[in-house]
């Protein structure tokens, strides 16, 4: 609990109380879609449904049918989801939910979601299928800020969900 207070103060100081986290669906120049997030703990199923709708409207690659989506999901590798010194038993509880870029419902459903990437992938696939499409999903490493500045940005923002302001999100953690 003490560590959360320090983290909260640091976040407020560096980002400000009105900062909002973004989750984005972008189309790359080659037509591939990418889902990338900043760790919004309040991203929910309704937001995921809106991302699926946006993906279905664009398709996934040049020449692909409107019902096919080729999606790359930028997510941290599993070994980064928890601090190294956390006891594995703590990971089952809601307070031990993994820290990810694309958390759905705070990565907790009563207890912690043990594999949030698989949960997101499964729910996204179900939503695309429900809408009559098909999807190929691939997990990729997030691009660092230095790598991002070196790339040409020919991507097109298709949909964005923004979090509540930082001051409201902090009440979820404390």
Predicted regions and their residues:
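Short, conserved glycine- and acidic-residue-centered signature motifs
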Residues: 1-2, 117
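Active/ligand-binding-proximal structured segments within catalytic/core domains
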Residues: 2-11
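Conserved serine DD-peptidase/penicillin-binding transpeptidase domain
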Residues: 13-174
């Amino acid at each position: 609990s003490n560590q959360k207070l320090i983290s909260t103060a640091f976040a407020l100081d560096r980002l400000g109380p009105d900062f909002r986290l973004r989750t984005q669906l972008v189309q790359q120049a080659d037509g591939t879609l990418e889902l990338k997030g900043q760790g919004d703990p309040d991203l929910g199923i309704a937001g995921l449904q809106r991302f699926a709708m946006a993906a279905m409207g664009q398709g996934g690659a040049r020449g692909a049918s409107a019902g096919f989506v080729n999606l790359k999901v930028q997510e941290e590798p599993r070994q980064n989801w928890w601090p190294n010194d956390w006891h594995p038993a703590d990971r089952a509880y809601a307070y031990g939910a993994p820290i990810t870029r694309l958390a759905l419902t705070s990565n907790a459903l009563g207890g912690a979601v043990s594999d949030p990437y698989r949960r997101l992938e499964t729910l996204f696939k179900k939503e695309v299928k429900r809408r009559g499409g098909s999807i190929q999903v691939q997990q990729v490493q997030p691009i660092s800020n230095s790598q991002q500045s070196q790339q040409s940005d020919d991507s097109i923002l298709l949909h964005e969900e923004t979090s509540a302001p930082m001051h409201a999100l902090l009440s979820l953690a404390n």
